[in-house]
UniProtKB/Swiss-Prot annotation:
It comes from Haemophilus influenzae (strain ATCC 51907 / DSM 11121 / KW20 / Rd). It is an enzyme of class 1 (oxidoreductase). Homodimer. Mn(2+) binds at residues 27, 83, 170, 174. This is Superoxide dismutase [Mn]. It catalyses: 2 superoxide + 2 H(+) = H2O2 + O2. InterPro entries: Mn/Fe_SOD, Mn/Fe_SOD_BS, Mn/Fe_SOD_C, Mn/Fe_SOD_N, Mn/Fe_SOD_N_sf, SOD_C_sf. Its EC number is 1.15.1.1. Its cofactor is Mn(2+). The gene is sodA. Belongs to the iron/manganese superoxide dismutase family. GO terms for biological process: removal of superoxide radicals. One of its GO terms (molecular function) is superoxide dismutase activity.
């Protein structure tokens, strides 16, 4: 299977004034495309069982990848997986509600407390990386962060955390520097205006419906 750049499903300016069109275009058509190209190059010559895996499945099985290819696929299949989720997680005008809101209030105490923890994880991630809302194996919600293009699906030994990612925020400078320069906290605050809570809730509900550990 050859990876391809996913369509956004919306115009590059659809998230204005919160996320600017120029950044969105460069981020999607240049940065994400580079991860796709580099991942495809790294897949060449690998056994079919690895090549045919979906990216999220592949990065969950990094130990099965030959050592000489592992780093390239950790970075680039990771980048492809992360960005593919990121684009789907963005939309103006949705509302956090229903079972997901209830679970956030249960596990963080309040929506504001969740947002504060998420913002801290995103703001304090040194260098490049991601902040995540994940569903743990115990059926609880948690906030974690990863370096570079690591993903919680990679597991604790690789990424330093684990869980099923429901929502991720890219805090690489390429995600915000044209508009926000060094003001990462401002970018993080604007993120709440463009979270596609409908998508995140659907992801949460599908995962809990098929999980024996769901509470």
């Amino acid at each position: 299977m050859s990876y391809t750049l996913p369509e956004l499903g919306y115009a590059y300016n659809a998230l204005e004034p919160h996320f600017d069109a120029q950044t969105m275009e460069i981020h999607h058509s240049k940065h994400h495309q580079a991860y796709v190209n580099n991942a495809n190059a790294a897949l060449e010559g690998l056994p079919a069982e690895l090549v045919e895996m979906y990216p999220g499945h592949l990065i969950s099985n990094l130990d099965k990848i030959p050592a000489e290819k592992r780093g390239a696929l950790r970075n680039n299949a990771g980048g492809h997986t992360n960005h593919s989720l990121f684009w789907k997680s963005l939309k103006k005008g949705t509302t956090l509600q229903g079972a997901l809101k209830d679970a956030i209030e249960r596990d963080f105490g309040s929506v504001d407390a969740f947002k504060a923890e998420f913002e801290k994880a995103a703001a304090t991630r040194f260098g490049s990386g991601w902040a995540w809302l994940v569903l743990t194996a115990e059926g609880k919600l948690a906030v974690v962060s990863t370096a570079n293009q690591d993903n919680p699906l990679m597991g604790k030994e690789v990424a330093g955390c684990e869980g099923f990612p429901l929502l991720g925020l890219d805090v690489w400078e390429h995600a915000y520097y044209l508009k926000f320069q060094n003001r990462r906290p401002d970018y993080i605050k604007e993120f709440w205006n463009v979270v596609n809570w409908d998508f995140v809730a659907e992801r949460f509900e599908q995962k809990t419906a098929h999980s024996n550990c769901a509470k």
